[in-house]
A protein has these predicted regions:
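Alpha-helical phosphate/pyrophosphate-handling elements in metalloenzyme active cores
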Residues: 1
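Histidine-centered, transition-metal-coordinating active-site segments
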Residues: 5, 9-240
Length: 240
């Protein structure tokens, strides 16, 4: 229930703008371990749980923390190739985007086929569940190829990130990380508009309004892996 507690609006996009933003898993650790927050008190008093253990399961990739092996196993259930979050959002996104990729995934077969392997102290899948796993993996590939990484989505993402980056990198920016928590996506956009107006960032304002109103940049060129890839990428970096 708490694995997404560290999310802020557009966080999968904004957390790429490091070091201003932190990963939502790291933010979840900060929230859960804060003794002044109700979540910390409820975990200790109502559920008799150690908040550190809960934070370890969520923020298991944190290199600055020594994560016990038993917590890594639970983290593998929560966030892995077959985690419930992935099973949920891939099928749901497929349905609401009107693409058929999620229809081939047998969710019930997938869940019942997941077992614990005591020899390796890890999750395993029975032979009957192999086809269900393959369907999920292929669905994941198809969703990224055709939806998540579609050039229209990438255009909107790039425009929004640049609009935010121009604000945050300004020497007179007054926004802080905590300003992005506990607000809705609409409130975040209003906050950015106000800061762009105050700082006089007309270019960033145009990018933000273009994203909101779907006036997106068009595909200018397509670069495939090859000998000129580094040269072309450097050209675009120098251009901007």
């Amino acid at each position: 229930l708490l694995h997404d507690i560290g999310h802020y609006p557009f966080s999968h996009t904004l957390e790429e703008l490091m070091p201003f933003f932190v990963l939502h898993e790291e933010r979840a650790r900060q929230i859960i371990l804060d003794p002044s927050r109700s979540i910390n008190r409820v975990l200790r008093n109502e559920f008799d749980l150690d908040p550190v253990s809960v934070a370890n399961v969520i923020d298991y990739r944190n290199k600055s923390v020594d994560i016990p092996r038993r917590h890594l196993l639970l983290a593998n259930i929560l966030s892995g190739t077959l985690d419930p979050d992935k099973i949920d959002y891939l099928l749901r996104d497929s349905l609401f985007c009107g693409v058929p990729f999620g229809e081939s995934v047998n969710r019930d077969r997938l869940i019942t086929s997941i077992k614990y392997d005591p020899s390796g102290k890890r999750l395993a899948i029975t032979s009957k569940g192999v086809s269900a796993v393959e369907a999920l993996v292929f669905t994941n590939y198809q969703m990224y190829r055709n939806v998540y990484w579609h050039h229209t989505v990438r255009s909107a993402t790039a425009m929004f990130k640049r609009a935010v980056q121009d604000v945050l990198s300004h020497s007179s920016c007054q926004l802080r990380l905590d300003d992005f928590h506990g607000i809705s996506e609409s409130e975040l956009i209003l906050m950015l508009r106000e800061e762009q107006r105050r700082l006089g960032l007309e270019g960033a304002a145009l990018l933000l309004e273009g994203t909101v109103s779907r006036r997106l940049h068009k595909l200018g060129s397509f670069i495939s892996p090859g000998e000129r890839k580094r040269e072309l990428l450097q050209f675009f970096y120098d251009l901007y």
